[in-house]
Amino acid sequence: MSRRVVITGLGCVTPLGRSLSESWGNLLSSKNGLTPITSLPNYNEDYKLREKSIPSTITVGKIPENFQNENSAINKLLFTSQDERRTSSFIKLALRTTYEALHNAGLLNPNDITINTSLCNLDHFGCLIGSGIGSIQDIYQTSLQFHNDNKRINPYFVPKILTNMAAGNVSIKFNLRGLSHSVSTACATGNNSIGDAFNFIRLGMQDICVAGASETSLHPLSLAGFIRAKSITTNGISRPFDTQRSGFVLGEGCGMIVMESLEHAQKRNANIISELVGYGLSSDACHITSPPADGNGAKRAIEMALKMARLEPTDVDYVNAHATSTLLGDKAECLAVASALLPGRSKSKPLYISSNKGAIGHLLGAAGAVESIFTICSLKDDKMPHTLNLDNVLTLENNEADKLHFIRDKPIVGANPKYALCNSFGFGGVNTSLLFKKWEGS
């Protein structure tokens, strides 16, 4: 069995906004979602004393303080007093964003968080939500208390930190009784969650799923760790593909997608947004934090997605790149994209490429989920977003970069892209590519 899989609902909270419409609108409007670390409310208390490890010049991609739904009645259902005690921030963010995706998909009963069971069988409704780190805040704070004060541990400490508890809490809150599944593949987590849901539906194991990832890992310890690993830029500017790029900006956020078989979506007369047609993945088997210089692993993931979709390289119109603004990573990805997608392409069929991370930073585990949503919106709205802070494009051997159409200054509107690729790569050599198709009817 191999069924077609379509996208029917989207939800996200990002440094650009607390909803899909706000985030997408601000991305297209060249808004910068990055914040100087010195402007954080807890800067003096948590960061200033650690300036040797965390320079005051860095920026972060902070989500809005109040990311909850504007409807207070819905908030009371989503976040009970028990939830406040039992759940950590990445779980609460997942609950909030899942509500938006389910509402966007037209699955919820009016003014409620319950799913209309006349539209779907909850026994076949899967929940696939991952996180790269989980709750570093709870681990850090509980460790301090236990070590310094010998205080009793919160009985919910373990359920608050496990990365699968976003999926667990979402499935409980919305009564999703299909499979509960969670991956943690560093910065590829979101793409893997969506890709796995694609396969579960495609193979007939589930009829419908909510899939994505949540990350709220802005914390002195995580920042200090990434700075020590020389991953983060200390000049505060995320510059994907630029010759002056010097590392990523750490961000947080969440993205959720409702996916279902085409038959299931048509049966309930759903509003179909896009179709997922390919999923590729590979391992670099090279280094724990760096890709091979030639981007071979990323290339193989792209080629696998194309093969699954039964498409030619020239069919792809747009690449939403992982491009985190690191020296080695951006170049390796460009080489992979050029090698996999440029052969046979005529000058009349440009390959557009951009990165969202100039505007939102690197959302770690949630990056692929949020960027997949932006990729889907690019196809739906015929607007391919540009890369913020891209002034001087990197160079590649044999002038391959000249053959890629880097989107700068403003979005590309009216090019009518039909197929778009979203890449996400992670520490440990994880490579993932999702291939989306513009929905033009069955």
From Swiss-Prot:
Q: Which terms under GO biological process does the entry name?
A: fatty acid biosynthetic process
Give the catalytic activity: a fatty acyl-[ACP] + malonyl-[ACP] + H(+) = a 3-oxoacyl-[ACP] + holo-[ACP] + CO2
Q: Which GO terms describe its cellular component?
A: mitochondrion
In terms of PANTHER family, this protein maps to: 3-OXOACYL-[ACYL-CARRIER-PROTEIN] SYNTHASE, MITOCHONDRIAL, POLYKETIDE SYNTHASE-RELATED
Other remarks? Present with 1660 molecules/cell in log phase SD medium.
Name the Gene Ontology molecular function terms of this record. 3-oxoacyl-[acyl-carrier-protein] synthase activity
> Which species does this protein come from?
Saccharomyces cerevisiae (strain ATCC 204508 / S288c)
The residues annotated as the active site are: 187 (for beta-ketoacyl synthase activity), 322 (for beta-ketoacyl synthase activity), 362 (for beta-ketoacyl synthase activity)
Identification of the protein by name: 3-oxoacyl-[acyl-carrier-protein] synthase homolog
- Its biological purpose: Possibly involved in the synthesis of a specialized molecule, probably related to a fatty acid, which is essential for mitochondrial respiration. Is essential for oxygen uptake and the presence of cytochromes A and B.
- Kindly indicate whether the keyword Mitochondrion belongs to this entry: yes
Q: Which residues cross the membrane?
A: none
What does the record give as EC number? 2.3.1.41
Q: What does the UniProt entry say about where the protein is found?
A: Mitochondrion
The Ketosynthase family 3 (KS3) domain covers 2-438
- CDD domains per the UniProt record, alphabetical: KAS_I_II
- Family to which the UniProt record says this protein belongs: Belongs to the thiolase-like superfamily. Beta-ketoacyl-ACP synthases family.
Q: Which controlled-vocabulary keywords does the entry list?
A: Fatty acid biosynthesis, Fatty acid metabolism, Lipid biosynthesis, Lipid metabolism, Mitochondrion, Transferase
Q: Which Pfam families match?
A: ketoacyl-synt (PF00109), Ketoacyl-synt_C (PF02801)
